[in-house]
Regions:
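M16 family metallopeptidases and their MPP-like homologs
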Residues: 1-93, 111-119, 196-229, 233-285, ...
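Proteolytic maturation boundary segments
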Residues: 38-42, 49, 69-214
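Peptidyl-prolyl cis-trans isomerase
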Residues: 94-98, 102, 287-288, 293, ...
Length: 349
């Protein structure tokens, strides 16, 4: 069955339902674009290739899952080698017309179930059946336009002449590591392992973190730090970058901790260059986009708004506040409404 889901603030369920139904109807009326299809194909093949390359070191839980499905659902277990080769063989032949026709078969106006959930609060009115039906009718009559694909990113970075040099190389025979010292003082330590056939895991950090901020600035910025990457880099939005990375195995996550700042991530041999470009971009080309922070804040607020009504969370939060008495850098274990009111995106940036 076809399913869709939207997460909204309290009292905004009907707005969320309308947006969700509009996007479903847009796909139903106009279908997906050729670029979207090729991006999806590339991602499917990239994920299968990664699993295939590590087929001799598959985690047990993945194997157990297949065995359980085979026993309970009589699902075949041909193995990743067969799945990868077969997918490589038939996936290119899947046409846009086939995909769009399947969407039309899935999206129907009859036999539809809509479930709306929300907290019970004084003054908060839940949507009625008639209101839901009205939204559905409005979407049916809405004059929607096809999704327009933006131009893809050709290059994440503009060409530039690198002045970086390796000024020192050291090895540690006991640890099996090699350390490269660069002319800017950065030290790069790497070690070859056989844990995975095609995986590079990395972390980069420097001392400092949020400890360098004053107590007053920290309170304004602490919950904004995770949102900074939402703005994208080098003038490209996060959506642009996500599309650019389709078909690549690249994960890069910048962070600012209490005592350190840096990036964590992983990639593959062939995508290492892209991962390094993204790391460089986070350091040198982070976008300033207050609108992206507002969207992030609204999304986080919707998820956490009702957590204090959970007895277990309420106890954990109050217990933490008790332990952190007179600590000017502690507010709550997760950002609540009063924390977002103090948040200052410009200060954090």
């Amino acid at each position: 069955a076809f399913q869709g889901m939207a997460l909204t603030k309290d009292g905004k369920q009907l707005d969320g339902l309308k947006v969700l139904l509009e996007e479903v109807e847009r796909a139903n009326k106009f279908g997906f674009t050729a670029v979207e299809l090729e991006r999806a194909k590339a991602q499917i093949l990239s994920n299968l290739e990664k699993t295939y390359n590590n087929r001799d070191k598959t985690d047990s839980e993945m194997l157990v899952g297949e065995y359980v499905n085979s026993f309970l659902e009589q699902e075949p277990i041909p193995g990743i080698a067969w799945e990868y080769q077969q997918t490589k063989s038939f996936l290119p032949s899947v046409s846009l017309e086939q995909v769009n026709s399947i969407v039309k078969n899935y999206v129907k106006y009859y036999s539809k179930v809509i479930v709306i959930t929300g907290p019970k609060k004084d003054g908060l009115v839940q949507p009625t059946e008639n209101q839901v039906l009205k939204v559905m009718d409005e979407v049916k009559l809405a004059k929607l336009t096809p999704y327009e694909e933006k131009a893809n990113i050709a290059n994440l970075l503009k060409p530039f002449k690198s002045t970086g040099k390796i000024v020192k190389t050291e090895t540690d025979a006991k640890l099996g590591t090699t350390t490269l010292t660069l002319n800017n003082g950065v030290k790069v330590t790497y070690k070859k392992t056989d844990f995975k056939e095609d995986e590079i895991v990395f972390t980069a950090r420097s001392l400092g973190g949020s400890s360098l901020a004053s107590d007053a600035d920290f309170v304004k910025a602490q919950f904004v730090f995770p949102a900074l990457a939402e703005a994208g880099v080098n003038g490209f939005s996060k959506t642009d970058i996500t599309n650019y990375l389709a078909g690549k195995q690249v994960s890069v996550s910048p962070f600012i901790g209490n005592l350190t700042e840096g990036v964590n991530g992983k990639t593959t041999n062939k995508d290492l260059g892209t991962a390094l470009e993204l790391i460089y971009s986070y350091f040198t080309g982070l976008n300033y986009d207050p609108a992206s922070f507002t969207a992030y804040k609204d999304k986080q607020s919707a998820m956490t708004a009702n957590m204090l009504s959970n007895p277990q969370f309420y106890f954990s939060n109050e217990y933490s506040k008790f332990l952190q008495q007179k600590n000017p850098r502690f507010t709550n274990i997760i950002p609540l409404t009063e924390d977002w009111e103090k948040a200052d995106y410009k200060e954090a940036y």
